[in-house]
């Protein structure tokens, strides 16, 4: 019977010979010629894709069996060479199986893909440790078949001792396993020599893989059936051996690859198929934890560590390998939704946590600085709550459109009083300036003010909303400003008015005056009482009271004899022609008062005051200007000049160094600018939003990528 049946391969643990088992179990069984070998595929590492199947079929169709005669010296390897080659084996009888080694066939193994593993047992799914369920990353493992119970016990003892160390090194070995063992199984022919790994550890760990197509080509069916029946029974009794402990060492892998003999055409086709496989993006590059796809009878690494029980689940022999693969593919497709959800969580939640921590760390010193340093409000004022409009006086009762509160008085003067009111149709809060008129001259002056305000549309100038005319009064409905007069802040000793505050106020005044002069309008009554603060805490201002304003025409000589004495320009006192520099003198006086709280030309009476103005008798008070910068003094000196042509214009003031580089001045005075703080907060919020946007966009791309892969996966 030894001559009629092909000699089995030697399982190199303890000199065990499969031929003894073949004789034992096939002694009284008749040969069956028509039965085809039932060789199955076992899912050892991960699911097998259609491209992997194409690679395997290409290799099997194009490979040529390599026949080595038993007595050929070239097929023998030197036992002295420690290169992983096998020693020549001698044939043995039935009674001498444990003492003599038989001549076995030379086997060269080449796996078609790192994710595809074959085994003898078609109906057995070995238990695996799914460290990283990622394609193209699991290592090829060769499953050992122990010879007897003693070998099995020794192997399991070794596995249990090394399981803790294997858990720690699992991720490292998974990353280093990209260099796969590309080996394939050649046909088994009588007389060939069996490759044997001389490494002591590998002698107990090598397993053989038999390809169904190659067996059909090279082995008669009747003998193969008997042999496969024996091997199937033997495989059912085998315990599961840890996958990582059975990996071939790098030298052994290289020695096996040296034995590969594939035709050039087959190599080209295989390389092309491998390139197609490598074009698919690897999931391990996505840096995303993926849910473990669980199958019946398969434990995860954590479960195996906790339970330490290795059992081989029973397999229904009615199921063919193709059905098993389809079932696993369906399970993989079913878990795509869970995987996508996990991608969203991993891509957003951890990053959001890190972003929040970063923003908190950045915001902590910012809050500390805000609490210790003085904050200067340099933000520009908001525009009026209504659009600019052209207004004409209506000769209808004001009570039909507005509800005026006669008790709440906002201000007053020579013209009358200002009351708070509200529009009946919209509820908009406004201010009603009620001016008493006794004759046509006064009425014309008020209508002139309406005409001037119709031309003004600037954030630093008060806006006109509506106007009403009656027999005794003219009422102007204007924008409501609640902060009070700038003069009140100047004289308030409890209010801390710094030089930077004065810069902010002066710059806004110059901006408003510049706009007036661009419209060829002269205010002619600029003073702190006619400059209102938008609110009680901020530094935003609006210029009001255009009752004395005039339209400037260069060809017409304009003279005025009115105004507040201490703010009058020399040309007004002399009753000379007025022009744009007249307003700039008033700006210089206001700036002097903002920095010192004093009036530069104030005398004991109005006559002395105007005399000081005519002769330009003023100086910087030593005590008041002790801590004022030279730039501020130069700015004032450039405005309080007797000659009109020598004064700075509004545009020139805007270019002066004192009104610019506010950020540098804030650092020098160790204060904070509100606009700078708002800008920093905006930039921090914008960066945080941008990071969140990129995280969500990346998660969406990954989700679409997973969906496309699930659609392209064959069923």
From Swiss-Prot:
Q: Which organism is it from?
A: Danio rerio (Zebrafish)
- Give the similarity note: Belongs to the protein kinase superfamily. CAMK Ser/Thr protein kinase family.
- What are the top taxonomic ranks of the organism? Eukaryota, Metazoa, Chordata, Craniata, Vertebrata
Which reaction is catalysed here? L-seryl-[myosin light chain] + ATP = O-phospho-L-seryl-[myosin light chain] + ADP + H(+); L-threonyl-[myosin light chain] + ATP = O-phospho-L-threonyl-[myosin light chain] + ADP + H(+)
Q: Which domain of life is it from?
A: Eukaryota
Q: Where is the active site?
A: 525 (proton acceptor)
Q: Which GO terms describe its molecular function?
A: ATP binding; myosin light chain kinase activity
Q: How is it modified post-translationally?
A: Phosphorylated on serine residues.
Protein name as it appears in the record:
Myosin light chain kinase 3
């Amino acid at each position: 019977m030894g001559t009629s049946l092909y000699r089995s391969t030697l399982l190199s643990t303890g000199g065990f010979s499969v031929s003894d088992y073949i004789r034992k179990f096939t002694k009284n069984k008749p040969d069956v010629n028509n039965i085809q070998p039932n060789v199955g595929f076992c899912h050892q590492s991960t699911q097998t894709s259609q491209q992997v199947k194409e690679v395997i079929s290409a290799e099997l169709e194009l490979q040529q069996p390599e026949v080595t005669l038993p007595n050929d010296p070239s097929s023998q390897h030197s036992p002295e060479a420690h290169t992983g080659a096998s020693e020549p084996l001698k044939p043995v009888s039935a009674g001498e199986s444990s003492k003599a080694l038989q001549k076995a066939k030379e086997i060269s193994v080449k796996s078609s893909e790192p994710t595809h593993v074959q085994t003898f047992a078609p109906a057995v799914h070995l238990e695996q440790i799914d460290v990283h369920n990622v394609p193209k990353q699991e290592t090829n493992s060769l499953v050992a078949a122990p010879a007897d119970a003693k070998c099995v016990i020794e192997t399991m003892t070794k596995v249990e001792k090394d399981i803790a160390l294997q858990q720690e090194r699992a991720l490292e070995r998974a990353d280093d396993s990209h260099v796969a063992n590309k080996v394939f199984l050649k046909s088994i022919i009588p007389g060939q020599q069996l490759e044997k790994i001389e490494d002591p550890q590998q002698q107990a760990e090598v397993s053989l893989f038999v390809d169904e197509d190659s067996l059909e080509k090279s082995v008669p069916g009747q003998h193969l059936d008997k042999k496969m029946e024996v091997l199937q029974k033997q495989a059912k009794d085998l315990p599961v051996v840890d996958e990582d402990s059975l990996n071939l060492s790098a030298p052994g892998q290289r020695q096996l690859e040296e034995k590969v003999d594939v035709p050039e055409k087959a190599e080209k086709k295989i390389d092309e198929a491998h390139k197609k496989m490598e074009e698919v993006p690897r999931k391990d590059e996505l840096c995303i934890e993926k849910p473990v796809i669980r199958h019946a009878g398969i434990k995860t690494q954590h479960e195996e560590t906790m339970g330490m029980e290795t059992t081989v689940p029973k397999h229904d022999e009615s199921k063919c390998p193709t059905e098993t693969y389809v079932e696993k593919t369906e399970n993989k497709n079913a878990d795509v939704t869970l995987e996508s959800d996990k991608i969203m969580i991993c891509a957003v939640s951890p990053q959001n946590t890190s972003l929040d921590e970063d923003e908190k760390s950045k915001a902590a010193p910012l809050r500390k600085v805000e609490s210790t340093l003085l904050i200067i409000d340099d933000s520009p004022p908001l525009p009026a709550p209504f659009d600019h409009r052209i207004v004409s006086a209506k000769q209808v009762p004001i009570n039909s459109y507005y509800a005026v509160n006669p008790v709440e008085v906002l201000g007053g003067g020579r013209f009358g009083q200002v009351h708070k009111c509200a529009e009946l149709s919209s509820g908009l809060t406004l201010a009603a300036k009620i001016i008493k008129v006794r004759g046509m001259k006064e009425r014309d002056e008020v209508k002139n003010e309406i005409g001037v305000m119709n031309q003004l549309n600037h954030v630093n100038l008060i806006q006109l909303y509506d106007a009403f005319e009656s027999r005794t009064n003219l009422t102007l409905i204007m924008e409501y400003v609640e902060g009070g007069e700038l003069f009140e802040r100047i004289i308030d000793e409890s209010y801390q008015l710094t030089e930077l505050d004065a810069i902010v106020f002066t710059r806004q005044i110059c901006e408003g005056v510049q706009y007036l002069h661009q419209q060829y309008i002269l205010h002619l009554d600029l003073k702190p009482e006619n400059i209102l603060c938008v609110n009680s805490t901020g530094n935003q201002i609006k210029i009001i009271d255009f009752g004395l304003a005039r339209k400037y025409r260069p060809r017409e000589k304009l003279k005025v004899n009115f105004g507040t004495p201490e703010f009058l320009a020399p040309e007004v006192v002399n009753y000379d022609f007025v022009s744009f520099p007249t307003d700039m003198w008033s700006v210089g006086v206001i700036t002097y008062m903002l920095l010192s709280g004093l009036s530069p030309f104030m005398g004991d009476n109005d006559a002395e005051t105007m005399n000081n103005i005519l002769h330009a008798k003023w100086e910087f008070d030593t005590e008041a200007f002790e801590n004022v910068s030279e730039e501020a003094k130069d700015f004032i000196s450039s405005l309080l000049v007797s000659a009109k042509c020598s004064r700075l214009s509004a545009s020139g003031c805007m270019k002066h160094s004192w009104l610019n580089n506010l950020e540098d001045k804030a650092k020098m005075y160790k204060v904070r600018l509100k606009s700078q703080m708002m800008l920093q907060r905006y930039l921090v919020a914008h960066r945080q939003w941008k990071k969140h946007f990129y995280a969500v966009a990346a998660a969406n791309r990954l989700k679409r990528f997973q969906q496309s892969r699930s659609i392209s996966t064959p069923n």
